[in-house]
Structures are given as structure tokens and as C-alpha cells.
UniProtKB/Swiss-Prot annotation:
Signal peptide: none annotated. It comes from the Eukaryota. Keywords: Acetylation, Proteasome. PANTHER family: 26S PROTEASOME NON-ATPASE REGULATORY SUBUNIT 7, EUKARYOTIC TRANSLATION INITIATION FACTOR 3 SUBUNIT F-RELATED. Acts as a regulatory subunit of the 26S proteasome which is involved in the ATP-dependent degradation of ubiquitinated proteins. The gene is RPN8B. InterPro entries: EIF3F/CSN6-like_C (IPR024969), JAMM/MPN+_dom (IPR000555), MPN (IPR037518), MPN_RPN7_8 (IPR033858). CDD domains: MPN_RPN7_8. This is 26S proteasome non-ATPase regulatory subunit 7 homolog B.
Length: 310
């Protein structure tokens, strides 16, 4: 583990993790090559830098990883391959250090803490970024965690490590943005109108909101049933969300919603009516054109071939 000798990474509390598009593309390619159409996950190393509580993940590479499906405590990660790859990457860019590891989860697993403890030997306070390579809803397909020691209230119980969630962002340098724009331009369906795209985006966003609300409800139910410990920080955040909700019992607000809804429904009705009238006019014009073509065909003289008697 001589890899850690040249690394200077702060062990302070991590507040945010920034993931670059190149990392996402590399991880998806790794998954498609190794574990596509299977229940397996792939694991690799994250490279980047850490400063003032922000981890900037700019690169990554795959690492051979195997685990037993029946016994999660049995797993293997190739240390020699990992250290050889890091030395080669360091020759290319000495500013990139090991900042953690990634997994295609798509959620936390029982042996993740053991794998995380392994990376503690390479970098202080590593991050785990779980990438959902097959997302079912709109949003950032990354979830980041770092491990902390949880001290039990009962002094007789030993402390244990637990994962703490940290916010993630997708950011890119100017060169990366140009590449991503070209990729999106190639995969974008030009036959879909802007209105249809906006409606689809709104619908997807509402589905995502519904999923988040259901997740909050499930968490609160588990807390009430005593299956999960009470976390005051989460409850404070939920209370802040509820405090931001508008008071819908105000008459002026109810009237404004009604007027806005009526205006939108009127626009939809007029648009449908105009579209129907235009379609009817197009049908009539086509009928008239067809009749004119038929008359023109009928008015043409018919050439009768002459028959000569032998």
C-alpha cells in the first residue's frame, strides 16, 4: 500500500461530492462490458481531488471484483491490479489522487463497509459513490456516502461504522461540456416537438416527486414502528420542507389557482378547436384538388390506334 505515501488529502468532514461526465461514461462502459443483463455489480476506483470539504471526482478506472451471491462476506478485490493502475494514472496526471471507490449497487450492500475499510488504507476518509446505470426516474444517478463512527448511547456497546449520505452534483469543465453537447445532439430525437419534450419533462419530474414523497412516508412509518432509529436532523429537514409549503386555505390563493386553471383550459380548448378547423380545411382542399385532377384526366383526348387491313 505504498500508494498512499504521495497522497495529501484532507480528512475533514465531506460536505459535497462533484462527479464529472467522464466518470459516469467510464462506469457505464465498465458495467456494459462486465455485468450487463446480470445481477452483478462492478467496482472501481475514483480519482480526483479534495479541498475544503468538497470532493471533485474527475477520473476513474475499473478494478477486478468478485463476491459470493449467497455469502456477502466473501469477496475479492485485486490489490495488485489497483496499485499498478494507479501508478500508471499518476504518471499521466500527478494531480489526481485516490478519493474513494464506486459501485453500481444500485444501493448499499452488506459488505460495502468492509470494502470501504479496505480503501481507508489508501486514502483517509474515502467516499463511496453508487451509480445507478439503469435509472427508472429523472434525477442525478449518483449517491455518495462516507463512513463515520457511530457512538452508542449505552457505554457498554461498541461503536460501529455507518455510512452518512452526502449531496452530489454533476459538473464539467468546458471541454467536457462540448463533448457532452455533441453526444446529446446525436441521441436527441429531432422528430419530437419542444412542447412534447416539456410535457414529458414535467411528467417525469412529478413522478420523481411522488417517489420522494412515498420514500419519506415509508421512512416515517418505519420510525413510528420502531424499525429505524429517530434521526432529529432528518426530521428538522422535513419540518423545513413543510414550513415552505404555501397556505392553500387563503381565499386569494384559491381564486388565483382557479383563474390560472381556467385560463389554461381555455387555451387548450381554443388550440384544439383551431387544430380541428385547420384539419377540416386541409381535408376540403385535398378533396377539391383531387376533383380537379380527375377532371383534368377526363378532359385529355384519348388516342385510338389505327387498324390497317392487310
Amino acid at each position: 500500500m505504498d500508494v498512499i505515501k504521495t497522497q495529501q488529502i484532507s480528512a475533514r468532514t465531506i460536505e459535497k461530492v462533484i462527479v464529472h461526465p467522464l466518470v459516469l461514461l467510464s462506469i457505464v462502459d465498465h458495467y456494459n462490458r462486465v455485468a450487463k443483463d446480470t445481477s452483478k455489480r462492478v467496482v472501481g476506483v475514483l480519482l480526483g481531488s479534495s479541498s475544503r470539504g468538497t470532493v471533485d471526482v474527475t477520473n476513474s478506472y475499473a478494478v477486478p471484483f468478485e463476491e459470493d451471491d449467497k455469502d456477502t462476506s466473501i469477496w475479492f478485490l485485486d490489490h495488485n491490479y489497483h496499485e499498478s493502475m494507479f501508478h500508471m494514472f499518476k504518471r499521466i496526471n500527478a494531480k489526481e489522487h485516490i478519493v474513494g471507490w464506486y459501485s453500481t449497487g444500485p444501493k448499499l450492500r452488506e459488505n460495502d463497509l468492509d470494502v470501504h475499510a479496505l480503501f481507508n488504507g489508501y486514502v483517509p476518509n474515502p467516499v463511496l459513490v453508487i451509480i445507478d446505470v439503469q435509472p427508472k426516474e429523472l434525477g442525478i444517478p449518483t449517491k455518495a456516502y462516507y463512513a463515520v463512527e457511530e457512538v452508542k448511547e449505552n457505554a457498554t456497546q461498541k461503536s460501529q461504522q455507518v455510512f452518512v449520505h452526502v449531496p452530489t452534483e454533476i459538473a464539467a469543465h468546458e471541454v467536457e461540456e462540448i463533448g457532452v453537447e455533441h453526444l446529446l445532439r446525436d441521441v436527441k430525437d429531432t422528430t419530437i416537438s419542444t412542447l412534447a419534450t416539456e410535457v414529458t419533462a414535467k411528467l417525469t419530474a412529478l413522478k420523481g416527486l411522488d417517489a420522494r414523497l412515498r420514500e419519506i412516508r415509508t421512512y416515517l412509518d418505519l420510525v413510528i414502528e420502531g424499525k429505524l432509529p429517530l434521526n432529529h436532523e432528518i426530521l428538522y429537514h422535513l419540518q423545513d420542507v413543510f414550513n415552505l409549503l404555501p397556505n392553500l386555505n387563503v381565499n386569494e390563493l384559491v381564486k388565483a389557482f382557479a383563474v390560472k386553471t381556467n385560463d389554461m383550459m381555455l387555451v387548450i380548448y381554443l388550440s384544439s378547436l383551431i387544430r380541428s378547423v385547420i384539419a377540416l380545411h386541409s381535408l376540403i382542399n385535398n378533396k377539391l384538388l383531387n376533383k380537379e385532377h380527375e377532371k383534368a384526366e377526363d378532359s385529355k383526348p384519348v388516342d385510338i390506334p389505327l387498324i390497317t387491313e392487310s
